[in-house]
């Protein structure tokens, strides 16, 4: 998707910071995991930062939706109801239908309406991108007939992988509430998301998958044609 990814990532207990920068545009901003007194809470929260510059900083004219603001939208019981629905979806994937790993998700609007359910179909569809969060996001966008989900919250049974987290940014979600951590999914399912985060921190030449650019001028010509389109839709 991108010929160059310049990123910085730190993986520590209780905190993950990931930045992906391509062609000077922020793809994924700063992410903080909130923990109380170093104890694992019943639900953890990922605030999604909208916008940013090439250094990963949030510009002054962009609003950050905080954990407190999102969690204050509904009573604790409603948040737990949405999370239990996401967990039930994870059971469909990993135990009942056996379509993939035990990952499930739901998308909830600002008004508290569930507009999409999703669960992992990687094995059933032979599709490495068919994660529970991706399934839910695709269905929500299809329902709303737009590629953005501002005002919505993603509830997911497990802490999102780098792909799903990046997609949450592209979709413009207000926040993510998750159940199990990446450490849990690694311990019980052998899903090593931390390896991918660590790869982003490595220089391009040291990564497990090589990257190089080719025929850039020809590729840029198409971008110029796209830029000249009067009817293009920015997203």
Question: Predicted segment positions?
Answer:
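Zinc-dependent deaminase
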Residues: 3-96, 167-235
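Immediate flanking context of iron-sulfur cluster ligation sites
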Residues: 146-158
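A short, polar/charged loop-to-alpha-helix boundary motif
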Residues: 122-135
């Amino acid at each position: 998707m991108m010929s160059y990814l310049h990123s910085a990532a730190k993986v520590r207990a209780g905190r993950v910071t990931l930045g992906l920068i391509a062609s000077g545009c922020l793809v994924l901003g700063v992410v903080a995991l909130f923990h109380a007194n170093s104890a694992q809470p019943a639900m953890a929260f990922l605030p999604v930062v909208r916008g940013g510059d090439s250094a990963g900083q949030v510009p002054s004219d962009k609003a950050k939706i905080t954990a407190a603001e999102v969690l204050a939208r509904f009573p604790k019981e409603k948040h737990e109801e949405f999370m239990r629905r996401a967990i039930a979806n994870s059971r469909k994937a990993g135990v009942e239908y056996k379509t993939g790993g035990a990952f499930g998700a739901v998308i909830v609007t600002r008004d508290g309406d569930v507009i999409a359910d999703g669960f992992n179909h990687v094995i059933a569809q032979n599709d490495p991108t068919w994660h529970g969060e991706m399934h839910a996001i695709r269905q929500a966008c299809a329902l709303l007939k737009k590629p953005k989900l501002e005002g919505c919250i993603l509830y997911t049974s497990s802490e999102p992988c780098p792909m799903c987290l990046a997609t949450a940014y592209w979709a413009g979600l207000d926040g993510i509430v998750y159940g199990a951590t990446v450490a849990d999914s690694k311990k019980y399912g052998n899903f090593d998301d931390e390896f991918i985060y660590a790869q982003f921190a490595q220089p391009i030449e040291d990564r497990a998958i090589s990257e190089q650019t080719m025929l850039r001028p020809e590729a840029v010509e198409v971008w110029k044609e796209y830029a000249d389109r009067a009817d293009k839709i920015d997203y």
